[in-house]
Amino acid sequence: MKVLKLITVVALMMLFVTGCNIKTESPEQLAKIPDYDDTKKVLYDGIDQLLKPDSSMILPSNTKEVGKINKVDLNSDGIDELVVFEQKEDLSNNVSQVGFVTLSYNGEKYVLGDHFLENGESIEYANFYDLDSDGYKEVILLVKSKDKTNMHIYKVVDNEITKIYDLDASWLQNKEDFNDMKVKIGYIDGDDKLDILMLHLNNKTNEMFASVANFDGKMKIKDSVKFENVKNLSELYITLGNVASSVGNSSAAIKGIVLDIPILKDNNYITQILYMKDGKINKAFSDYDKTITKSYYIPVDDIDKDKIIEIPIVAGSTGNNKNTYSSKSSATISWYRWNGKEGADSSLIFTSQIYYNYKYNFKLFIPNNLFDKILVEQEFVGEKAV
């Protein structure tokens, strides 16, 4: 629907809001001060005046990628539109809807365009990609309604929003039992086409399927792979990028997916690498390989800046000796990268070992010839560190 209402908040053209997360991103970021800009309040106030009394702005769960208010060139004309995520609540009937509203700039003012709402309580994921390469960025939402999360895709043309796709996970047997979902979009297999990684979890059986697809108006599934004993998706982390250097005569790095998965056994995590080969999803390791198991989540990182993702493993995290792994205030972390090989030849290659002290904000590089031969501990006299 079109609403002929104009706003003259000039600041909207210059400002936009993204999510804020003060959680440590990596062992390399020992301390991080969140950014704050009080001029963003001008933007919030301007948008608030446009929303109906029973509506408010809402922040999707993937706060590192989007905010409540986003500047996006949806139609590739060089001019950014505003996409604002909103929630509408009917308290008398206990009904909640979530969705988004668009605003376009006509050269002088922002014009309130269209809005679209879905029944649901939260937006678990939101982003903007030209999935079908037609020059228009689609708006992708994961909406949670009661106990079910599903994906919806929209296109905005001439300020009108059209829903072009509701996901039907028909490739999954007993699809109705897979009620939780997570998504990541990016270049996964090196074919220069945007891929959609979809994770579906059966909360009753703790089975999860990871599926890779392309979208051209319809969802084209490339392949799926199964995981067992998955605790939940809310604590699962996805990283896309180069997962191994070139192998054999190939000069290109291997692109893939790194999944940090919370598992039921001992409330541990496993770090698994997925990659595409001959149209199929492959796992780099066995899910039961103890070398990829850790007691809590530690983000992967490109520790040596070679554009290959390294996997962190903490001293004492495997085997019977876990006493050095009990404290989150400090840790001795060994960094490894995958060798890019398959089957029995697949293994991790040691890169470096670093001691991190998060309480006192310092790190200590351990020489490679002393790898796993020394233990770094903090000494205290009373309440003071020596």
Ranges and model annotations:
Residues 1-25:
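Sec-dependent N-terminal signal peptides of Gram-positive bacterial secreted proteins and lipoproteins
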